[in-house]
Regions:
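Acidic, metal-coordinating helix/loop segments flanking the phosphotransfer/catalytic sites
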Residues: 34-52
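Short amphipathic alpha-helix used as the core "switch/output" element in two-component signaling
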Residues: 65-77
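Active-site residues of response regulator receiver
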Residues: 56-57, 84
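Conserved active-site segment of CheY-like receiver
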Residues: 9, 83-87, 107
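Two-component/phosphorelay signaling modules centered on CheY-like receiver
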Residues: 11-31
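Acidic catalytic/metal-coordinating carboxylates
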Residues: 35, 63-66
Length: 126
């Protein structure tokens, strides 16, 4: 079983994504965070444990790009899927430049979101 971190300010959305990851991809939830600061602290506490991060772009204390910078500085090699309702291309491009594997709309079909996560090499069986 693989491990995920979910970064999203809304607990109900985190719980729904965790359920889908466990049910469809056999991914265990390792950490949850609702802010950039919390995500940074938890990711750096667990180097090498987290196989994938699913993060909202807009967070109460910043956005996913701040978290991506922290991951880069820590040389963490973990794929990050950024989910957002924001449509502005510059913020999507910035997230990709800083290391996000993909940026997707939160209203994308669930199957597409799961397929994107499934495509991350670290989630394949050893």
């Amino acid at each position: 079983m693989r491990c995920a971190m979910l970064v999203e300010e809304h607990a109900a959305f985190r719980q729904a994504v965790a359920y889908l990851l466990a049910r469809d991809l056999e991914v265990a939830l390792v950490e949850e965070a609702s802010t950039v600061a919390e995500a940074r602290a938890k990711a750096l506490e667990n180097p090498g444990v987290i196989d994938v991060v699913v993060s909202e772009l807009s967070l109460p204390d910043g956005d996913a790009t701040d978290f991506l910078v922290a991951l880069r500085e820590a040389e963490a090699d973990v794929p990050v899927l950024v989910l957002t309702f924001r449509k502005d291309r510059p913020s999507h491009e910035r997230a990709l430049e800083l290391g996000a594997e993909r940026v997707m709309s939160k209203d994308a079909p669930v199957g597409e979101i799961l397929a994107a996560i499934r495509g991350f090499g670290d989630l394949e069986d050893d």
